[in-house]
Amino acid sequence: MTPVLDITDVTFRRDGKQIIDGISLTVQSGEHWALLGPNGAGKSTLLGFCAAVTFPTTGTVHVLGGQMGRTDLSVLRRSIGHVNPRHRLQYPLTVREVVLTGITATIDIAAHWTPTPEQVCRADELIDTVGLSARADAIWPTLSQGERGRTLIARALIADPQLLLLDEPTTGLDVAAREQLLETLDTLDVSHPDMASILVTHHLEELPTSTTHALLISQGRTVASGLAHEVVNTEHVSEAFAHPVVVGFQDGRWSARAKASSRVL
């Protein structure tokens, strides 16, 4: 089976600085990966490889069977969904209109484009999936951060992606909104069983229960990679974040806290 994503020994340098140093990652259909690491670890750069928008300095990147540099990237990108909570709109679109922009891959409704009745129906189905049916006609500025996050998930799904990328999707959310968004992500394991996903975060509490695998990085290098329940542990997280922590796991969710000896008294 061809992997959804196959990154082999990639490096990336910018302005003489080594940002990524020999990372490899293979993602299969239906797997849900967490990309964990501290600020400045190289997570955003690595996600750029996954999205087929950033070229490595050395190494190879295969996305959906196509190798970057040897295939039409615009075709690949149509099958990649991207959820970014910093998504900016120029116009006050409704929830439904925002979701429909996922078809055209534009920030706003594309000029001279009108969605078909089938596309509008599909948008409404996805809006219902993320629990926002009552807000379908609400305009973007009136939405809470949590509602915006769930709208962007629906937007990413409308093009039926094979790979879903989530760039710190719970940024700026309170606890209730975070939990609602994570519950939404967990439902995708059932509604889109073949879709693979990669979620970027530096907080273990933001990992949904559907997480199957994890890649922990630090200073552009791999600390650990594999099944989430095997690699998201006290040893690896402490190494990745260069700080002694205790990792907990209960009811399918992870947590992290400082070791007692490292707390400031």
Where are these regions (language model features)?
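Conserved catalytic motifs of ABC-family nucleotide-binding domains
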Residues: 160
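ABC ATPase NBD coupling module
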Residues: 67-81, 109-116
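The feature captures the beta-strand-to-loop junction immediately N-terminal to the Walker
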Residues: 36-38
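Helix-to-loop junction immediately C-terminal to a conserved catalytic motif
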Residues: 51
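Conserved ABC ATPase signature
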Residues: 139-143
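Catalytic Walker B motif of ABC-type/P-loop ATPase nucleotide-binding domains
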Residues: 164-168
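Conserved ABC transporter NBD signature motif
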Residues: 59-68
